[in-house]
UniProtKB/Swiss-Prot annotation:
Active site (catalytic residues): E135
Protein family membership: Belongs to the polypeptide deformylase family.
GO biological process: co-translational protein modification; translation
Protein name: Peptide deformylase
Source species of the chain: Polynucleobacter necessarius subsp. necessarius (strain STIR1)
Keyword tags: Hydrolase, Iron, Metal-binding, Protein biosynthesis
Residues annotated as binding Fe cation: C92, H134, H138
Domain of life: Bacteria
Amino acid sequence: MALLTVLCYPDSRLHKVAKPVAQVDARIKKIVADMADTMYEAPGVGLAATQVDIHERIVVIDVSDEQNELMVFINPEIVWTSSETKSWREGCLSVPEFYDEVERPAEIRVKALDIDGKEFEIEADGSLAVCLQHELDHLQGKVFVEYLSIFKRTRISQKMKKRAKELIGQR
């Protein structure tokens, strides 16, 4: 399998809204496998296709301690959220080394297709609920830093642009 390049904030491609997957076929299964390899290599607990410049509604997640329980969500949608919210410290492979508190619904229910194209629903709380909401935001073109104050967003954007220039200068 191939490792994919993860886009870094504030890359405008992170703001593209992903399109639904028409059919779960060999191409989609290869994308899922490559996304999983990329997520585990990073290492991360979730990855949306948007983050690797593939603008289709695909998410891979593994919040297990051993990183051996891959979950695949194709065309995921949140069908229910609890009224109770919880604040979690979030990070993102597209915003490396930056973490901050984001408040989200404490529990959710998601409907999606699995790797075989079969529909399923899952109820989630805790880290899985947070990760699902975070990754589904990516499919809508939203990055977690957009929940932060304009001051924090601007500071993160400036630091990420500076880091990108430094990386280009090292080549």
